[in-house]
């Protein structure tokens, strides 16, 4: 996290793990959103991902390594991540998601929570939950139908269709494609 000239830059920084969300990242995300929302000097927030992609969703490999099962781990992760998303949705300053590469699962939900979504031409958007045998999370089951309508949201969720940046723009999921 850095703040320059009133603009806060919050970068998901797990590039070697596709910026997937694990407990430490979820906790850091929540803490950062709380602090930035309380900072009167922040007039805008830009969300991005380090490395080759924005965010590939939850860290499923980490979930599977839990000795006592993933349930308690995931519950703690979700508590922090969802609390951060709720604050982000009502953030007192405009939120811009700068998406490149994949925005999958909860990563897609995170991007779509922003007020403005600017995507690189190489961006791809996918729900990814059904491929992993999971139900939608990360706010996607609420925000997606509100942005693009129920029929298209069901298509993306149930068929696990991947959208290009151009298709996401056509669907109304993003604001513009960066050139």
Regions found by a protein language model. Name each.
Residues 32, 80-91:
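Catalytic-core regions built around general acid/base machinery
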Residues 10, 14, 28-29, 47, ...:
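Terminal peptide-recognition signature
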Residues 1-50, 86:
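Conserved CoA-thioester-binding segment of acyl-CoA-metabolizing enzymes
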Residues 49-85, 103, 131:
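Glycine- (often His-adjacent) and acidic-residue-rich active-site loop
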Residues 44-46, 70, 116:
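Short, Asp-centered acidic motifs that coordinate Mg2+ and/or phosphate
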Residues 86-179:
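Crotonase-fold acyl-CoA enzyme core
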């Amino acid at each position: 996290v850095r703040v320059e000239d009133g603009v806060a830059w919050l970068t998901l920084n797990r590039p070697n793990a596709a910026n997937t969300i694990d407990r430490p990242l979820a906790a850091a995300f929540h803490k950062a959103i709380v602090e930035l929302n309380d900072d009167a000097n922040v007039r805008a927030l830009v969300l991005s991902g380090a490395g080759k992609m924005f965010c590939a969703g939850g860290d499923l490999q980490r979930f599977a390594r839990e000795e006592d099962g993933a349930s308690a781990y995931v519950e703690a992760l979700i508590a922090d991540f969802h609390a951060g998303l709720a604050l982000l949705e009502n953030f007192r300053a405009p939120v811009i998601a700068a998406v490149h590469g994949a925005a999958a699962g909860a990563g897609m939900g995170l991007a779509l929570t922003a007020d403005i979504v600017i995507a690189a031409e190489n961006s791809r958007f996918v729900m990814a939950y059904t491929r992993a045998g999971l139900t939608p999370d990360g706010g996607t089951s609420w925000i997606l139908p509100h942005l693009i309508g129920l029929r298209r949201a069901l298509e993306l969720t149930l068929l696990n269709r991947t959208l290009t940046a151009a298709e996401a723009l056509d669907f109304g999921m993003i604001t513009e494609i960066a050139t």
